From Swiss-Prot:
Name the UniProt record assigns to this protein: PKHD-type hydroxylase Shew185_0721
Top EC class for this record: oxidoreductase
Entry's Gene Ontology molecular function annotations: 2-oxoglutarate-dependent dioxygenase activity; iron ion binding; L-ascorbic acid binding
InterPro entries with a match to the protein in the record: Oxoglu/Fe-dep_dioxygenase_dom, PKHD_C, PKHD_hydroxylase, Pro_4_hyd_alph, Pro_4_hyd_alph_FE2OG_OXY
Annotated Fe2OG dioxygenase domain residues: 78-176
Cofactor, how bound (note): Binds 1 Fe(2+) ion per subunit.
Keyword ATP-binding included in the entry's annotation: no
Record keywords: Dioxygenase, Iron, Metal-binding, Oxidoreductase, Vitamin C
Pfam families: 2OG-FeII_Oxy_3, PKHD_C
EC number: 1.14.11.-
Organism annotation: Shewanella baltica (strain OS185)
Gene3D superfamilies the UniProt entry points to: q2cbj1_9rhob like domain, Rabenosyn, Rab binding domain
């Protein structure tokens, strides 16, 4: 399941984020690469321990945990703290699959979902599409600044070469309360239907029944 979430951050907020990011020292992006990815990856990143990157990453996590659509789709249990990368001058990241397990200060997490928060407007750079191969075929993603795409970490994906301009983004992984992608999709669809029916002031008893089904399925499928 691939979900695009628009306007997680406003244009003004993105501008403020970029001012802080652009002033930092960027390093070789292979810091977070697995052994197979190092030959395919050419980009720049902020060091994961950079204090500004850590603070902005926390700001992003706080925003996402307060975003109803993100929480509904991801059912987040634990984040790998957001990192920041940029591509320019032909830099690219060829097709790869993200590592299944990552280490955090609090222990190990299973990477169920990956997310990219775009911090450059699409017209400001040429190339740089996030191309994802999923069960519905190939999808090419290039969102407006402040918007986010969420997709299974098991997906084969790449960032195409940035031929001009600069593509800056935040990226992150998370472990979901529900490991199985199909189960997460069903829960998301059910929750979205409940929210739609609630807005339409549907019959209270039917909403009560559907909400009960949702929580009983979540209880059955979740791993905490």
């Amino acid at each position: 399941m691939l979900i695009e979430i628009p306007n997680v951050f406003s244009k003004q907020e993105v501008s403020h984020l970029r001012e802080q990011l652009d002033a930092r020292r960027w390093i070789d992006g292979n810091q977070t690469s697995g052994a197979m990815a190092t030959t395919r990856k050419r980009n720049q990143q902020l060091d994961k321990d950079d204090p500004v990157a850590v603070a902005l990453g926390q700001q992003i996590m706080d925003r996402l945990l307060a975003h109803p659509q993100f929480v509904s789709a991801a059912l987040p249990l634990q984040f790998y703290p957001p990192l920041f990368n940029r591509y320019q001058g032909g830099e690219t990241f060829g097709y790869h699959i993200d590592n299944a397990i990552r280490s955090t200060p609090d222990g190990m997490i299973r990477t169920d979902l990956s997310a990219t928060l775009f911090l450059s407007e699409p017209e400001s750079y040429q190339g740089g599409e996030l191309v994802i191969q999923d069960t519905y075929g190939q999808q090419s993603i290039k969102l407006s600044a402040g918007s986010l795409v969420l997709y299974p970490s098991s997906s084969l994906h790449q960032v195409t070469p940035v031929l001009s301009g600069e593509r800056t983004a935040a990226f992150m992984w998370l472990q979901s309360m529900v490991r199985d992608e199909g189960q997460r999709r069903l829960l998301f669809q059910l929750d979205q239907s409940i929210q739609t029916l609630t807005a339409q002031q549907a019959a209270e008893q039917e909403l009560f029944n559907l909400t009960g089904i949702y929580h009983n399925l979540l209880r059955r499928w979740s791993e905490l």
